[in-house]
Amino acid sequence: MAKLTKKMKSIKAAVDSTKAYEINEAIAVLKQFATAKFVESVDVAVNLGIDPRKSDQNVRGATVLPHGTGRSVRVAVFTQGANAEAAKEAGADLVGMEDLAELVKKGEMNFDVVIASPDAMRVVGQLGQILGPRGLMPNPKVGTVTPNVADAVKNAKSGQVRYRNDKNGIIHTTIGKVNFSEEQLKENLQALLAALAKAKPTTSKGVFIKKVSLSTTMGAGVAIDQASL
């Protein structure tokens, strides 16, 4: 831990916390200090002009990033009949109904995303206490409860990110890996911010996207000058 602490101190010392960096400069800084032995993720924190205490101002949704996230996603689908075949053809890793529910109850959850057709919610609903705390419970607001499970599987596999503000009104998600090109990361960030802008609650007044910061898995946060986007 001492080495990590020393490294973090040096990174924070090199990043001007009072400055909003132009996007390409920010990405260059992130790449410079991404020296972990694995390919670090590039994460984003977006401070929104909302009151998270008000339910009608909470922001939640999903969008497909043009260049994906750089990570392989395992998808489980609760459905049956023709939809089950369509889900398999679309690339789902696990497809089932009661049999899949039994695996979940046993703690066998080797998947990152859960999708369900509406008729399967009678089964999935019984798994709320298991899936909910893990952020895996299907929800129509993010497109994971849908009659078109094949498209949902394709979206999940092609780099869809889900977002939801925390209690401080901040969205945290990933926009790729540090080995992505500057242009790929920039375009992914632009796609996310465009999706957030469309999701602005009608009751939210004033500046909606107040601050955007990027960081890598092991790095410090870098504030972004939104004018450079």
From Swiss-Prot:
One of its GO terms (biological process) is translation. Keywords: Repressor, Ribonucleoprotein, Ribosomal protein, RNA-binding, rRNA-binding, Translation regulation, tRNA-binding. It comes from the Bacteria. The keyword RNA-binding applies. One of its GO terms (cellular component) is cytosolic large ribosomal subunit. GO terms for molecular function: rRNA binding; structural constituent of ribosome; tRNA binding. Part of the 50S ribosomal subunit. Belongs to the universal ribosomal protein uL1 family. Binds directly to 23S rRNA. The L1 stalk is quite mobile in the ribosome, and is involved in E site tRNA release. Protein L1 is also a translational repressor protein, it controls the translation of the L11 operon by binding to its mRNA. NCBIfam families: rplA_bact. This is Large ribosomal subunit protein uL1. It comes from Pasteurella multocida (strain Pm70). The gene is rplA.
